[in-house]
Amino acid sequence: MKVVILSFTQAGTRLGERIGSQFRNEGITCQNYAPAGYAFADILPFPDNPKELIREGWGETSFLFIGAVGIAVR
């Protein structure tokens, strides 16, 4: 199993880091992405084309999107 976590806010990035760490502790391959300003250590900056990352992994990778609820429901 492979998991990709994409976070969009500073708080979401911190949450994604904790979730990703748990996945990795359980032996699950997990990669976190965030805006460049929030990227550090194991958190990579968003790729130039995030849609391509999602397209390539669709059906084989589990994606977790962490963002503000106001953004998600609009």
Language-model segment annotations:
Residues M1-E52, E56:
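N-terminal, charge-rich interaction modules
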Residues L53-R74:
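Glycine/small-residue-rich interface belts in oligomeric ring/scaffold proteins
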